[in-house]
Swiss-Prot record:
It comes from Citrifermentans bemidjiense (strain ATCC BAA-1014 / DSM 16622 / JCM 12645 / Bem) (Geobacter bemidjiensis). Pfam families: DALR_1, tRNA_synt_2f. The gene is glyS. Its EC number is 6.1.1.14. Keywords: Aminoacyl-tRNA synthetase, ATP-binding, Cytoplasm, Ligase, Nucleotide-binding, Protein biosynthesis. This is Glycine--tRNA ligase beta subunit. The lineage of its organism: Bacteria, Pseudomonadati, Thermodesulfobacteriota, Desulfuromonadia, Geobacterales.
Length: 687
């Protein structure tokens, strides 16, 4: 009969960002442990607060099933000598398995006959396994940072204070560090700091709420959402939507309640982004706006307790925020005393990267690169691109950005407008940082897009040119994000700029800094972009369609994306399977291609003439469709060749004895392969 498992790890407050990942990791770890132990299980539930992590598994089998385990040993050729006697290899294998050599069996595999030890194992009770399994699971939860405490040889995100471990309502006995497992949990640190017994998950959830703890993060999130909307209504305002902040705050509290505070309207002269950033990033406050979206001089904060006198909490939060906003106002006023243009020179003293020079040198490189992009794609904005590129990093040496790095670019725009710069230039200064995250907002203007593309490409090519290449999960310069940003901007704007030309232009400007051969760097950078482009497209379209197109060419990203979309749509045809098989056959026969022209005089079968005539007619239609970038139409025209191709293969022996006839037939098939090869490599498609 299946039983339920319950585990709670109670500890000091865990950083908010650690909790959701720990919950996901606990689910993965228990699955791995149970699968390895051959223990069947049902639904898995994970919960978490700053002070506790919970794992509950329903329908856990009472014991392992009996099993027959096979351990493979040496090959038969190494296991017995010429007289059929066991060798030392066989004897050693038997000894290692704890059985007599006579008990070994020969097993036939794909690689031949091998010696094997086949042992029967009686399944153990799950209750016997859990005292070994659970402490291992706790110790294996991976945290970005973990710690030891006292003199115990265990690590966790924060010191553990209690562990509840129950299987079928009974305590699973084990120790982790200095903590023995038990059946008692604890309530809210401030509102109900007492222990209470736990029987199972349902009982635990009831008792937690009685002790002012909401273990379910989704429920806490909905409570917070309702609370901030309630308080915002009382304050005659609306909450500025911020799902990321809502998610973060939900892991900062166990029993949320909201209060409303205010700040002086005098601070509203500071750009709203600075005020919002200060409240969100530094204080975890929700901002308030009126019905027209205008920022109001108020905020909502989430407490971890319900207080008898909320005004005490409000005044404390207002005092902290007032100090923070006073700093922002001071920097804002001081920064206005120096024009943005005058700050550009200061970039010469800011090291961008030791091998790549200063921020000023970087600016000079991507300014020239942006200028070249503009000249090729929209010459009318070249002057504005140069101006925006010159100014876009100047706010990095301002007081405001020094104090609030999150508003870089935004302050550049504000200061540029204050100094009388063109609005298009000022907006481009802010836009050049976009997108800041996957799926994020993209530059609206060509000016901002060109500066953004140039800056990001200089970053990627610069790092690759001095050997700073992302490896595994390590990407300290966020090059993957920059590459995706470039790809998304190009696709969004429809820029027909060959990627290889763009990369080469950037590397030419980096030649004095590069420590690697530029040709080698160019190949690595293009391979890097190819990987990012394939991943991006594979999220939207079948991966084989993506590979089929990209393997032919992806230098023109807009064209490649359009071909992928067309091919993905084309494969929805009912007859796609037979089409793919027919075209794959053509590709496989003429892998290297034949460059000789087709001679109709060498045709010996009517099927050859029919295929040649069909190819001639279709080639013109395909060329016209490609000229219009109508790739689906081109593929549809190519599909009309199938009857002639099928007839050709049915009637004609391609590899004729006469070499001239054979080469002529291969040349005919080469023409077909190259026709659809201009769109995709059909050999990579699954039928």
């Amino acid at each position: 009969m299946a039983k339920d498992l319950f585990l709670e790890i109670g500890c000091e407050e865990i950083p908010a960002g650690f909790v959701p990942k720990a919950m996901a990791d606990m689910e993965l770890l228990i699955k791995k442990e149970f699968d390895s132990a051959r223990i069947e299980y049902g639904e898995i539930v994970t919960l978490g607060t700053p002070r506790r992590l919970v794992l509950a598994v329903k329908g856990v089998a009472e014991r392992q099933p009996d099993a027959e385990l096979t351990a493979m040993g040496p090959a038969k050729s190494h296991a017995y000598d010429a007289d059929g006697n066991p060798t030392k290899a066989a004897q050693g294998f038997a000894r290692g398995q704890g059985i007599d050599v006579s008990q070994l069996k020969l097993v036939t595999t794909e690689k031949g006959e091998y010696l094997a030890a086949v042992k029967s194992e009686i399944g153990r009770a799950t209750a016997e396994l859990l005292p070994e399994l659970l402490p291992r699971l706790i110790g294996n939860i991976p945290f970005k940072k973990s710690m030891r405490w006292a003199d115990f040889d265990v690590r966790f995100a924060r010191p553990i204070h209690w562990i509840v471990a129950l299987f079928d309502g009974k305590v699973v006995p084990f120790s982790f560090g200095n903590i023995d497992s038990g059946s008692a949990s604890r309530g809210h640190r401030f509102m109900a700091n007492t222990s209470f017994p736990v029987r199972d998950l349902a009982h635990y959830l009831e008792e937690c709420e009685r002790h002012f703890v909401i273990p379910d993060p989704n429920k806490r999130k909905e409570i917070i959402r309702a609370e901030i909307e309630r308080v915002a209504k009382q304050a005659k305002g609306n909450v500025l939507p911020d799902e990321a902040l809502l998610e973060q705050v939900s892991y900062l509290v166990e029993y949320p309640s909201a209060v409303h505070g205010t700040f002086s309207p005098d601070f509203l002269v500071v750009p709203r982004e600075v005020l919002i950033t200060s409240m969100r990033e530094h204080q975890r406050y929700f901002s308030l706006v009126d019905d027209e979206g205008k920022l109001l001089p108020g905020f909502i904060t989430i407490n971890n307790t319900i207080t008898e006198d909320p005004q005490v909490v409000v005044k404390g939060n207002e005092r902290v925020l007032r100090a923070r906003l006073s700093d922002a106002r001071f920097f804002f006023d001081e920064d206005h005393k120096v024009r943005l243009e005058a700050r550009v020179e200061s970039l010469k003293s800011v090291v961008y990267q030791a091998k790549l020079g200063t921020s000023y040198e970087k600016m000079e490189r991507f300014r020239e690169l942006g200028k070249r992009l503009a000249q090729r794609l929209n010459p009318a904005v070249t002057k504005e691109v140069e101006r925006a590129a010159t100014l876009c990093k100047a706010d990095l040496v301002s007081g405001m950005v020094g104090e609030f790095p999150e508003v870089q670019g935004i302050m550049g725009r504000e200061y540029a407008l204050h100094d009388g710069e063109e609005k298009a230039v000022a907006n481009a200064i802010a836009e050049h940082y976009l997108p800041t995250q996957a799926g994020g907002e993209l530059p609206a203007s060509d000016i901002g897009a060109f500066v953004s593309l140039a800056d990001k490409m200089d970053t990627i090519c610069g790092c690759f040119s001095v050997g700073l290449i992302p490896t595994g999960s390590a990407d300290p310069y966020a090059l993957r994000r920059s590459a995706l940003g470039i790809i998304n901007i190009i696709l969004d704007k429809g820029y027909r700029e060959p990627l290889s030309d763009f990369v080469k232009a950037s590397l030419d400007l980096l030649s004095a800094k590069a420590t690697r051969p530029l040709a080698e760097v160019q190949k690595d950078v293009l391979d890097f972009f190819r990987g990012r482009f394939v991943n991006l497209m594979a999220d939207r379209f079948p991966s084989d369609a993506v590979e089929a197109v990209v393997s032919v060419s992806f230098d023109d990203l807009v064209e490649a994306a359009a071909k992928i979309e067309a091919l993905a749509g084309f494969r929805n045809r009912d007859d796609f399977g037979p089409l793919a098989v027919a075209f794959k056959r053509v590709c496989n026969i003429v892998k290297d291609g034949v460059d000789t022209p087709v001679s109709t005089e060498l045709f010996q079968d009517a099927a050859e003439g029919e295929l040649h005539q069909a190819l001639t007619q279709v080639s013109g239609k395909v060329a016209a469709a490609l000229k219009k970038a109508d790739y689906l139409a081109a593929l549809t025209e190519i599909a009309t060749l199938k009857p002639a191709v099928d007839l050709f293969f049915e009637k004609v022996m391609v590899m004729a004895e006469d070499e001239r006839v054979r080469q002529n037939r291969l040349a005919l098939l080469t023409g077909i392969a190259r026709l659809f090869g201009s769109l995709a490599d059909f050999s990579r498609l699954s039928p």
